[in-house]
Amino acid sequence: MTTGDNTPVPDFLSRLRVDGRTFVVAGAGVGMGRMTSHALVQAGAKTVVCVDVDADRAAEIAAEIGPAGVAWVGDVTTREGAARLAADAEAINGRIDGLVDIVGMARWESILDMTDETFDWEIDICLRHAFLLSQAFGRLMSKSGGGTMVFIASVSGFTAAPMHAAYGAAKAGLMAWVQTLAIELGGFGIRANAVAPGTILSPRMEAVFSDEQRALNAGNAPLQKMGATADIASAALFFSSDMSAYVTGRTLVVDGGVDAKFPYPVTL
């Protein structure tokens, strides 16, 4: 089919498919990583390497997504772990088509009370490991015709929150890192993008949020609800597929509109 000016019309739904491709999901055992693994398989991925530091979690999600799932256990915040993951993943099908990096955690400490250990831990788990993974997988993808990298950032990298300084700084650094990845690796056919979630009601958050906290977070969003892990998985699939074939170096905010909201004391 063509348009009136003879421009070919693509099959848009097929652009969201990732048939036959091999992906690595770092942090696949819980929440957003778990849902992203399902999204990739539903879109046709041949293999999804499910990475977690916990052997039971890795095995569980690999079994859950079916024959495409491959469990991998290790610590990707070390150079040795990142290199081993890249080598093991490449050995499965001879190439890696996409990386989705969802590794990261936050500690709540004020700047005046923060220890060196907490600051270093946040930088390592939210930023430094992304350097290790993107370097290891970038080297592989640059030799095999390209691929996609998707990193989970945070709205904390755009806007500040009390007790969140090290986490926010690491996530802001991650978004800057993604931009440089995009311009350095674009010539190899590698696209790098990030997703910045707002408050997502993951199983981990469900376990700690009170009803009052849930209502407060939902009410703060223009959409009047909290996000779900499927919302983040959908964004990760978009960036991992040809639906975003001409998008690189970008961060997509998925927060229900919170980041767009000026806290003006007027209700409609």
Model-derived regions, located:
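Alpha-helical segment proximal to the catalytic Tyr-Lys
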Residues: 139, 183-187, 245
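Conserved glycine-rich Rossmann-like NAD(P)H-binding loop of the short-chain dehydrogenase/reductase
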Residues: 45-60
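C-terminal substrate-recognition "lid" of short-chain dehydrogenase/reductases
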Residues: 134, 191, 225-254, 259
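Residue(s) in the substrate-gating loop at a strand-loop-helix junction
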Residues: 154
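Active-site helix of classical SDR
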Residues: 134, 170, 178
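Canonical Rossmann dinucleotide-binding motif of NAD(H)/NADP(H)-dependent dehydrogenases/reductases
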Residues: 11-49
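Substrate-binding pocket helix/loop in short-chain dehydrogenase/reductase
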Residues: 110-111, 115-123, 217
